Swiss-Prot record:
Subunit (UniProt): Monomer.
Name of the protein: 3-phosphoshikimate 1-carboxyvinyltransferase
This protein's record includes keyword Nucleus: no
Top-level class of the enzyme under EC nomenclature: transferase
The keyword Transferase is annotated on this UniProt entry: yes
Pfam family, one: EPSP_synthase
Amino acid sequence: MKRMKLRTNAGPLQGTIQVPGDKSISHRAVILGAVAKGETRVKGLLKGEDVLSTIQAFRNLGVRIEEKDDQLVIEGQGFQGLNAPCQTLNMGNSGTSMRLIAGLLAGQPFSVKMIGDESLSKRPMDRIVYPLKQMGVEISGETDRQFPPLQLQGNRNLQPITYTLPISSAQVKSAILLAALQAKGTTQVVEKEITRNHTEEMIQQFGGRLIVDGKRITLVGPQQLTAQEITVPGDISSAAFWLVAGLIIPGSELLLKNVGVNPTRTGILEVVEKMGAQIVYEDMNKKEQVTSIRVVYSNMKGTIISGGLIPRLIDELPIIALLATQAQGTTCIKDAQELRVKETDRIQVVTDILNSMGANIKATADGMIIKGPTVLYGANTSTYGDHRIGMMTAIAALLVKQGQVHLDKEEAIMTSYPTFFKDLERLCHD
C-alpha cells in the first residue's frame, strides 16, 4: 500500500495564506441559487469535492450551472423549476449535500434515491427522516438509524411543523427550513444550542423571510426566492489548521487573509485566545463578517471546552486536540458526542492517531482529556477517509523530530481543501 510521506521537523512557518472558500456557505449558495428565480452568481466558491457533489446533484435535477470568469453562474427557475432526475443522486462524502438537498426535495412532486460513499453510508439520517416524515414526506434509509441510501418521495402539500431539535445540528435545522419554504403555514424550529446560522442568513439574503428569536426560528411558507450575487469568504474551518500550526511551531508568523468570522463559527478564536494565543485581527469588516488574522507562536495553556461553545467549533475540535497536546496542563473537551458521527468517529480516531505519535489523550463518551505538552514521534497513520483528520495529521507531523509520518488515503483532503499540501510547502521556509 502506497502511503504519503508527510513533511516532518519543520522550521518556523512564515507567509500569507488565502484559505479556500467557506464550505458551508458554498453549499448553501448553490442550493438556494438553484431554486431562486433568475441568475445567481457566486464568487470565491470552494471547489472541493463536497461542493462539486452538490453542484452535480442540481445539474441532475435539471438546473443549468456553469463557470464563467471564475464565477459560478446558476440559472434558477424557482422551486417549480426542478425536474425528476433520470438517475440516482450521488452525494459522495458530503453529509451536508444529502441532508440539505433531502430537505429541499421534500416539497417536490417526484421521487429520488440518494446515495453516498462508504463513509457517508455510515452516517445516520434518522435526524432528518423523522421531521421530514412529520411534514408529509415519504422518506426512508437502512435500519432504524436510517443510513443511506435514502429513498424520498416528495409532497407538494407539505405540512408545517414545530420541531425541537434533539441534537445540536445546523444540517437538520437547515433541512427543515428548506422544506418549510415550500410548506403552507408556520414552521418553527427550536434549537438545543445555537448552531451555525448560514442557512437563515442566506435565505434572507435571497429575499426570504424568517424570524430568529434566540434558539427559536419561525418561517411562514410558501415563499419564493430571488437570485443574488454572492461572495464566499474564506473558510474558518480550513484557516484553523494554519492558525494552530502558527501557534505551536516555534518562530512562526502567519497572515490568514479574508477569513469568514460569522459569530456562530468563531468558537475556535475564543478558545485559542483563552489558551494564550497571540493573534491580531486586521482589516476587520464587521458587516461582511470577514477579517485577516495574524498569528505568531505562543505559549499555550490547557482549558475546558464544553456546552454552547461546542456547536461553534465542532469541525475544529480535531486540530484543537492537537493544539492541546502542545499546551501546558490539561485540556478537557466535553459535550461533543456529535464528533462520533462525523466522517469518522473523530473522538476515537483523533485519540488513536495522536496517541500513536506519543500524545497523552483519553477518549471519553462525549470528548477527550488531553495532557500536555508532549513530544510527538513518527507513526504510520491514515485519514480513514476524513479530510479534517488528514490535515490535523499533516500539521502534527511538522512537530516530529524523530521518525517519519506516513499517511494513507490522503486524497480525502480534496473534500474541503484541494490546495492544502501546496500551501503547506509554501509556508515551510527551510
